């Protein structure tokens, strides 16, 4: 069989990536990435890295080339400041018309004059007898920039998600409700309540951006009480408004060197079992900080409770 050099080169450069996925978090100052590879039927967390957001496309191109990541499926997670999230009544229209109908309900609430792209995901429980949807609004220029940038870096863009959903991928599905407190370095605390793998409730807790600099004494003198009140309010809403069984467990992964002591303090103040989250995979390259949104994005299509740890 004869094959031209041009055809050979084309086939060579279209070979699939040896990596399973790459998760990218678009933060405020940095782009964080995690890479998953499947070897002998087991998923392995093989790389984690951070790049400056300034000229991020150039930096990402260089990293992809240096680490042979070309054509790897890529899942992008937007940091909390990159989008707006609204909860509204589900429009009473045909399924195919929902995406269009939601735009008119949230446009007046947008804080930016940019043209926006909208998407939504259904809320798993009715509130006050009404079905709800969570609407995500992202500026169109930002989406266009991401699509072009990922393509220029020679990655295969699979999904664009948000931090609340990406971090939800880190917890195995459970019939009991679990409240998670997750925080990226210098960010707000992201409070989620999950049940059976579904996100029932999400809040952003402000005022904890400098959590790493707070001492245990500062928490004991009042900050811990404030945080426990926010937790209790969220659990009360989950039970009373969403009519769900009580939360059974709290999981934390916070940006603080005293995380173990803080977890114990939360346990004492809420009278709830509290544990520090075990990451679903062990990194090949240990790092003092982990981008949870980036890791969760990389695990988007992996059942962590049954496959990832095998």
Question: Predicted regions span which residues?
Answer:
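Hydrophobic/aromatic-enriched cytosolic interaction surfaces used to assemble or bind macromolecules
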Residues: 1-310
